[in-house]
Amino acid sequence: MRQQLSSFKAEFFKALAHPLRISMLDALRDGELTVNEISQRFEVESANASQQLAVLRNKGIVIARKDGANVYYAINDRTIFKLLDVAREIFNNQLIGVRTMLEEISLEAPPGESYEQRS
């Protein structure tokens, strides 16, 4: 059972491992969007948007509904936003760490000398 869960997690995170897919999920926070709306929002071809959405759909992350000629996509489980929010928090924490490190390096530089001048 533990191996199955680890495999599920690996496949799940693999489905999320594309910047466009992450952006699409964030765009779906406010509700469903058509493929055309998504492709226009991110300035990508509809075929590319459809391909990326298919990856998310195949993993059950988004669901699709057809209405005439349009296919609407929505989030299947809104818990995904907690995960995206945690990822954003980790990103912010890393930026804070880098900023702190750069400030410390800057304080160590002799007056009138920048870090770049020492390299």
What does each model-found stretch correspond to?
Residues 1-5, 27-33, 37, 41, ...:
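C-terminal regulatory/oligomerization modules of transcriptional regulators
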Residues 5-8, 20, 67:
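N-terminal positioning helix adjacent to the helix-turn-helix/winged-helix DNA-binding module
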Residues 8-16:
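Short amphipathic alpha-helical boundary/capping segments
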Residues 17, 68-86:
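Short, cationic-aromatic polyanion-contact patches
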Residues 22-24:
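Pre-recognition alpha-helix immediately N-terminal to the DNA-recognition helix
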Residues 26, 51, 69:
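Base-recognition residues in the alpha-helical recognition helix of bacterial helix-turn-helix
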Residues 34-36, 47, 54:
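Residues within helix-turn-helix
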Residues 57-67, 74:
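Beta-hairpin "wing" of winged helix-turn-helix
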